[in-house]
C-alpha cells in the first residue's frame, strides 16, 4: 500500500470515529436479502461489515430472507410453488421445506460467513427461547372488476404477535451476533413462515433499535426524476405513497418502515445491498447510503 493510500484510509477512519461513538452500545437490526445473498463477494463484504459493527461496540442483529432459495428447493423436490395475490401459499409440506431452508441451510451459511471474520455468530429462529410467536396471517385482496375484497388462505403464513426480548438481551451482553430466520411457532402449535421484512421490523421494534436497515436491490426511495431521496419523515413518506411517487413493490417496504417506527425504532433505512460494504457506508459516513425514514 502506498503512502497516499494509507493517508486516505487514515482520513476515512478519522471521519468514521464520531459515528462509531454515536452508535456504541446501540442496537442495529439488519434485514439481509435480495441480490447480495446470492453473490459470494457481497456475502463476504456483508459479513465483514457486521463483524466491524460488533468490534466497534454496536449490537448488530441480522434477520434474513430466502424466497428464491425456498423456490429452488421446492422445485428440486417436485413441489409446485403456489401464489395468491403475489404471496406464497405455505401448506403443511411447504412449511417444512421453508423451515429447513431458512433456519437450516441459509441461516448456517450466514453464521459461517460471520464466524470466518473471527467474530461469533449464532443461528436462531423465532422458536428459540420462545423469542417470537405468530398467528395465521389475515390477508385480503380486492377484485379490480367487482371491487369486492376476499380473504386469502395462505396456509401457514404468519404475522408476528409477540416478541420476547429476553434471549436477545442476553446475547447483546455477550460476544455473540444473532442471525435470525423468520420462522416462528404459533400458540396453536403450528409453525409459521413470516415475511422477513415484517419479522425484522417486529424484532427491531421490540428492542427499540436505533436503526433498522433493509438491504434491497434498489438504492432506496426515488423521486419522480429517479433521484435518491436521502431522508423522509413518516408524514412525507405517506404523502409520496398517496401521490404515486412511491409505487409498486416499494409501497409495502415503506409501509413496513412506518410500522417499525410506530413500534419504537428510531430510524429505518432502505439501501442497496448490491453495493459492497453498504452497511458501513450507511452507519459510519456522513451522507449514508440509502433513504432514511424517521418519525
From Swiss-Prot:
Catalyzed reactions per annotation: N-acetyl-L-glutamate + ATP = N-acetyl-L-glutamyl 5-phosphate + ADP
Localization, UniProt: Cytoplasm
GO terms for cellular component: cytoplasm
Top EC class for this record: transferase
Residues involved in substrate binding: 66-67, 88, 193
Pathway: Amino-acid biosynthesis; L-arginine biosynthesis; N(2)-acetyl-L-ornithine from L-glutamate: step 2/4
Site feature location: Transition state stabilizer: 31, 253
Protein EC: 2.7.2.8
Keywords (A to Z) from UniProt: Amino-acid biosynthesis, Arginine biosynthesis, ATP-binding, Cytoplasm, Kinase, Nucleotide-binding, Transferase
Disulphide bond pairs: none
Family indicated by similarity: Belongs to the acetylglutamate kinase family. ArgB subfamily.
Chain's role: Catalyzes the ATP-dependent phosphorylation of N-acetyl-L-glutamate.
NCBIfam families assigned: argB
Protein's recorded name: Acetylglutamate kinase
Organism: Sinorhizobium medicae (strain WSM419) (Ensifer medicae)
Amino acid at each position: 500500500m502506498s503512502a497516499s493510500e494509507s493517508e486516505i484510509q487514515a482520513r476515512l477512519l478519522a471521519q468514521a470515529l464520531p459515528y462509531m461513538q454515536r452508535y456504541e452500545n446501540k442496537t442495529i437490526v439488519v434485514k439481509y436479502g435480495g441480490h447480495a445473498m446470492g453473490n459470494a463477494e457481497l456475502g463476504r463484504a456483508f459479513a465483514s461489515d457486521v463483524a466491524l459493527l460488533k468490534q466497534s461496540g454496536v449490537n448488530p442483529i441480522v434477520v434474513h430472507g430466502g424466497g428464491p432459495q425456498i423456490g429452488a428447493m421446492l422445485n428440486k423436490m417436485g413441489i409446485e410453488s403456489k401464489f395468491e395475490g403475489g404471496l406464497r401459499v405455505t401448506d403443511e409440506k411447504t412449511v417444512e421445506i421453508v423451515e429447513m431452508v431458512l433456519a437450516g441451510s441459509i441461516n448456517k451459511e450466514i453464521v459461517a460467513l460471520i464466524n470466518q471474520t473471527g467474530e461469533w455468530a449464532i443461528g436462531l429462529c423465532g422458536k428459540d427461547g420462545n423469542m417470537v410467536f405468530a398467528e395465521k396471517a389475515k390477508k385480503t385482496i380486492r377484485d379490480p372488476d367487482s371491487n369486492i375484497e376476499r380473504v386469502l388462505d395462505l396456509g401457514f403464513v404468519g404475522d408476528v404477535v409477540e416478541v420476547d426480548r429476553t434471549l436477545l438481551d442476553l446475547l447483546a451482553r455477550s460476544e455473540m451476533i444473532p442471525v435470525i430466520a423468520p420462522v416462528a411457532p404459533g400458540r396453536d402449535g403450528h409453525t409459521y413462515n413470516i415475511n422477513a421484512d415484517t419479522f425484522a421490523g417486529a424484532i427491531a421494534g421490540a428492542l427499540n433499535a436505533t436503526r433498522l436497515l433493509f438491504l434491497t436491490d434498489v438504492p432506496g426511495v426515488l423521486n419522480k426524476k429517479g433521484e435518491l431521496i436521502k431522508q423522509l419523515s413518516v408524514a412525507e413518506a405517506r404523502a409520496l405513497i398517496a401521490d404515486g411517487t412511491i409505487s409498486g413493490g416499494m409501497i409495502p417496504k415503506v409501509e413496513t418502515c412506518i410500522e417499525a417506527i410506530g413500534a419504537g425504532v428510531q430510524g429505518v433505512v432502505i439501501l442497496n445491498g448490491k453495493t459492497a460494504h453498504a452497511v458501513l457506508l450507511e452507519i459510519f459516513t456522513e451522507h449514508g447510503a440509502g433513504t432514511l425514514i424517521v418519525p
